[in-house]
Amino acid sequence: MTGGRPGTVVCHGWTIYAHPLFLAQLTALVVEVEAQKSKDAAGYLGKNATKRLAAMLQLGFEKIPQNPAGSEYEQGGTLGAEYKHWRRAKFFQQYRLFFRFHSRSKTIVLAWVNDDDTLRSFDSKDDAYRTFRKLLNSGNPPDSWEDLLKASQSGDTTLAKLTPKAAAPTAKVGRRLKTKKPPKPH
């Protein structure tokens, strides 16, 4: 999963960076999962935090890099016309991972993922899309590709160190997530 220059993460030929907002969320979730594992080595795999971490890793480092331009990641006008170029991956009904990509350079930036305080809920003040739009309007994360990439490259060594650490306690959960078959269309 690592490659390119030292400290970078490369998956399916795409270099992946994480904005500091995403890194902070990923780090907090890893700490939470590790604490749960130390308290309950057998039962932590069934906890929401462990499943969420496994889903985030699977999306960010497996599914999205397979085809970041996929129509399943288009978010339409939910963020407003000015932010239509942002993509989002849905997981566990109310969670969204927001990202951008640049095809020519084969680069993906994972920008932000909502948490339990900002679950997707139509017309809620704390809705994931509404919260992310506020973050974009405040300039953090930046909307400009160049500024977003610059802000995210500073954390690439942290991401490279954190990703295997995060993957270790969630490997069993991740295998279960990968083997789930999608529901058949009606």
PLM-predicted stretches and their roles:
Residues 33, 40, 44, 64-65:
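Hydrophobic residues in alpha-helical segments
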Residues 42-55:
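A short, highly charged nucleic-acid-interacting micro-segment common to nuclease
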